């Protein structure tokens, strides 16, 4: 789900890239064998081939100078509280059920037999779309995971595992397979991407890029955005789950992008875009919106109390399906932000909509997206559902 940077790192350090068995990248690397060991000073890393998330998935067991197995880096095979999803293999002839069965075997033959005092370091935590129920912790003892992780139940059959792991998986963001292909086939140097993307543009240069098809991406806070933004801008603030929403909503990974960014955050923005494969940022507006010589749009925002006092309003909830199913405002429309690009036929451009999410970040993204499509009668509910449910 990210461009890993391994090619740049290998080029700059001289280190070799190591892949698990069956991998077929388009560049020089080591295709390791199961149980192959690599020395790092006095330490040893042993590759454990653990197919399931993908056919080549592998974990790395850390062995100290005395020969004690002390930690395991589990990648997307084992998370804290969850396991890797089995539906992301690129161009595989295996079904997700096939891969889930392989994952069951890998967990039970390669990881669960290890000692309980081994520390687990997974590749992702809460908020990632790579699993369904990940913990926000970053490390845990393997023994704790054996006791608490639903997918490591000692009495779990393979059939039960396959059903539970494959049930309720939401479609992956569209950029996932594109990132995987870039990791396999190569990508532009990050230095080149940053140099291209951090060019300070004059207003005229900025307008020229827009005229040639560039997307305006505004990465300020939602509070700053609603007070004034360049028409047709897409808001995705750096202060939220930036990479995930970029990947979900900017459907063309080669889209040319121009930025409205807080001063000093331009390089960070370009870098974070590149991490999910968006390498075609071509500059930022020098001076930001204060230097813009045209009109600025604004978004009306009301409090949850003001919403409660509004009669006959049409509410649009843009939270995820699980959030909606847990609780929602009676008679609200449900339009998950994740899928808003897919179908807007239920929304009428002549109707006024009060838009909310959980806390106020996603609702502003949604409103900016709808305004790009010609919707104008949109009101943001500040504080989102968190504020709504606390009103009298």
Regions found by a protein language model. Give the residues of each.
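Active-site HxH/HxHxD metal-binding segment of metal-dependent hydrolases
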Residues: 1-47, 63, 68-70, 252
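Long, low-complexity segments enriched in small/aliphatic residues
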Residues: 199-208
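Rhodanese-like catalytic fold shared by cysteine-dependent sulfurtransferases
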Residues: 85-87, 93, 144-181, 185, ...
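Short, well-ordered beta-to-alpha junction loops that form the rim of enzyme active sites
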Residues: 122-127, 132-133, 178-181, 218-221, ...
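Metallo-beta-lactamase
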Residues: 44, 54-170
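Active-site metal-binding loops of divalent metal-dependent hydrolases
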Residues: 22-23, 54, 77, 83-84, ...
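Hydrophobic "anchor" residues on beta-strands that sit immediately upstream
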Residues: 72, 214, 313
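Active-site neighborhood of phospho(di)ester-bond hydrolases with catalytic His/Asp-centered motifs
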Residues: 1, 17-22, 49-52, 72-75, ...
